[in-house]
Regions:
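Domain-level signature for soluble enzymes in the chorismate/prephenate branch of the shikimate pathway
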Residues: 1-96
Length: 96
């Protein structure tokens, strides 16, 4: 690989790192909101809201199409995030 290509890759990776930092900040904000909602839940069976999950995924698909983003990719990302937050809520609920 040429020196120029290596430099281009490094520059692009630095941009990705900046985006990753922004994503981490958003995850922190999202987690704070999840914590606020979790504090209102009285029963463990309130953690998984299948209807809400379905609506979220439908909206993400629609928005992804509008932005010309691969809908399979965004579906997988959101599905993974939802699973992660469900596990997070279950873990935190046990400590209530």
């Amino acid at each position: 690989m040429s020196l120029q290509k290596n430099q281009n890759i490094r520059k692009t990776r630095k941009k990705l790192d900046l985006i990753d930092n922004k994503i981490l900040n958003l995850i922190k904000k999202r987690t704070s909101l999840v914590d606020r909602i979790l504090s209102e839940k009285k029963f463990k069976n309130q953690i998984i809201d299948k209807k809400r999950i379905k609506i979220i995924l439908k909206n993400i698909k629609r928005k992804s199409k509008a932005k010309r983003i691969d809908t399979d990719l965004t579906h997988r990302v959101w599905r993974s995030m939802i699973r992660g937050y469900i596990n997070y809520e279950i873990k935190k609920f046990k400590k209530k």
